């Protein structure tokens, strides 16, 4: 360490170019140069470019070693294979041409000799194996999807080929034969386009399965959706509910009339009234019903003779109830509860 002390002289060029570790490890100097006032240490921002340049030089050196390695073309080939998975055909073609060029360069590098860095050799082999396994993982779902579509196409083809006895198939085949004979007699070549084939396939499938589809549609249309009733039907039920709020229990005749006017069945009407009574109806106590039927004049009697007022109130209630036919506005049920 003492031999490096002269490098720390402030007036020496070597002192400015010496590493930072030397200046930190040797705070004192035995140089014979004249003493100068101690200057402030250089800011960290001034040292960053040197560190960055050193890091860049080290990175460039590692890249150069990797690119000059004999396994570098194989590494690029594995990377290109990963990029080819799921790529469009034109991109795959360009990548394949690039891979061919890399193969020719790989032969030249192999003839030049092997690398002398075992650690770098292990790194290259490990990274190549990792890329190969990654390509296999990428390829597996694509292969499964391709196999699925092939199976579906085979099933559709079997559907079209098995329909030799159907009327639609015979008519289409007859038309094709007749059309082919006319074109052959005219000396014109037969022209088939993908769009025409698709239309023919659609018409063929419709002719074969139209009966099944129509029956299925009728079956689905019969099943009514669960949930809210039609708006008009609910309005009619609510109107009846408002008229018979004191006792909202329709009779069988009224249920039949509601079913005819709303277009609902008896089960739907029963369920609607059950839910409506559970949510929006509270039975009124009988005492309150009688009190509501009592005339206003009967309430003025009081205080002097309780018995007289009671008898008078009772007679008033009876008189008030006379002539009422309980068509839903009374306190008693009209129909079956």
Curated annotation (Swiss-Prot):
* Disulfide bonds, paired cysteine numbers: none
Bias kind Low complexity: ranges: 27-38
- Supply one GO CC term from the record: nucleus
Which Pfam families does the protein's record reference? ELK, Homeobox_KN, KNOX1, KNOX2
Region annotated Disordered sits at 1-56, 159-190
Keywords for this entry?
DNA-binding, Homeobox, Nucleus
- The UniProt record lists the ELK domain at 200-220
Subcellular localization is given as: Nucleus
The protein's superkingdom reads Eukaryota
Q: Which residue ranges carry the DNA-binding annotation?
A: 221-284
Recorded hits in InterPro entries, A to Z, give: ELK_dom, HD, Homeobox_CS, Homeodomain-like_sf, KN_HD, KNOX1, KNOX2, TALE_homeobox
Chief location category: nucleus
Q: What would you give as a GO molecular function for this chain, any one?
A: DNA binding
Q: Which PANTHER family match?
A: HOMEOBOX PROTEIN TRANSCRIPTION FACTORS (PTHR11850)
Q: Which family does it belong to?
A: Belongs to the TALE/KNOX homeobox family.
| Record's protein name | Homeobox protein knotted-1-like 4
Name of the encoding gene: OSH10
